[in-house]
Amino acid sequence: MYLLEILHRSLSYEIEIEETRSSPNKLIKDSIQSWKNAFEKEYSVIIKTFYGSILNTIQCSNMTCGNIENVFEPYNCLQLDIDNKTNLYECLNDYFNEEEHINDWKCDKCQHIGCKKNTRLWSNPNYVIIQLKRFSRNGLIKNSNLVQYPIRDLDLTKYHSTLKSDNNKYIYDLYAVNYHSGQLNFGHYWSSCKNLDGHWYNFNDGNVTKITQEQLVTHDAYILFYHRKFIKKTLEI
């Protein structure tokens, strides 16, 4: 994601982000304010194309309190744990599963330590990037687990927050895969991409070869690139 950050910094400019629709929904207003805080001073076509917003709902685990905080977080890549997973939906279900007993959070209302956290998509970009977390934190151990992922019709609709009135479908098709073989410090990267002619091609250093769709899913798949089937011209924050 380093390249996206460089492109964003190079192309960024200041804009004025305004609420384009009146709404009594406080969450919508908060989401726009969060977007303004993050990008109003530095906006670019990269933000419009690759960035979305995640809603973290944090609830105090003290039953007599139940204080709820909603925190919006911009994202340009979903980093998914693949341990003991066989397909991408299992990874997504785990990522968006409710977390309980988070002990490093302190309630502002009752000062209780501990909460439950629920993560949901709030807005999704037209182009979604998904990273399969193959490396441990120290980078010394690689997980070569085979994770099946859809070439067509990846459905992210059910991972969207029910707190937002949204009847849209979020269906995506794969258009590129980045692969990695070896270990982090001495590995090799290459990519497969779908061309405008509808065929898939493998790009490995100076070699370009035509491949079949069946060759796309391997133990070396590292980063997946999806585009939305029905492109929205504007991002709904």
Where in the sequence are the language-model features?
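Papain-like cysteine protease catalytic cores
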Residues: 1-74, 111
